[in-house]
């Protein structure tokens, strides 16, 4: 239904809508690193597709306002799937969705943050889903708290990703993966901040 639903809703509600909500999670159940890391290209295509739909409805209605995007939920999520299937139904405060992230996950989160910055002209809000314990960059236990690998790209983007995003043109070798073509080996974004 992707595309049809967004277009239909905007066609009916364009004058009442300021933001279109997006959600997306990525996993690596197939243990396919090249394809997993290429998911940032899938996120880029997803954003571009929704922007095109918003702009098509705007053109059809001769609208003046530009609908922006709110990427309400995004993250890497797959490590805990098998463990969560074994949980007792209706248990009290079960430990669930507690993914323990690796370096591949940090690379993809970093690339997804780059993708969000590159689309800052239209993606005005983006929320990493969740922040503590549940598919999260920070984990806690009775004995303390620790930062996972995905914490660091998020932290550095928060520090250095403030300002005006510049149009960056990068020429680098590309590869094809199981689901994506022409994936660049180099992903980058520049942010100017006085």
Please identify what each model-predicted range represents.
Residues 43-47, 109:
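Aromatic/hydrophobic pocket-lining residues that form the small-molecule binding cavity
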């Amino acid at each position: 239904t992707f595309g049809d639903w967004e277009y239909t809703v905007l066609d009916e509600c364009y004058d009442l809508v300021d933001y279109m909500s997006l959600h997306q999670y990525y996993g690596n159940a197939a243990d396919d690193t090249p394809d997993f890391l290429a998911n940032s290209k899938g996120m880029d295509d997803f954003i571009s597709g929704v922007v095109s739909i918003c702009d098509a409805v705007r053109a059809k209605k001769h609208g003046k306002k530009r609908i922006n995007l709110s990427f309400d939920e995004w993250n890497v999520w797959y490590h805990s799937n098998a463990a969560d299937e074994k949980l007792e139904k209706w248990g009290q405060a079960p430990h669930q969705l507690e993914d323990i992230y690796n370096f591949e996950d940090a690379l993809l989160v970093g690339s997804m943050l780059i993708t969000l910055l590159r689309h800052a002209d239209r993606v005005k809000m983006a929320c990493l889903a969740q922040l503590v314990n549940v598919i999260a960059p920070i984990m806690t236990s009775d004995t303390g708290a620790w930062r996972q690998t995905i914490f660091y790209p998020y932290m550095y983007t928060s520090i250095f990703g403030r300002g005006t995003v510049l149009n960056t043109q990068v020429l680098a070798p590309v590869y094809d993966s199981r689901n994506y073509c022409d994936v660049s080996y180099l992903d980058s974004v520049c942010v100017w901040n006085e």
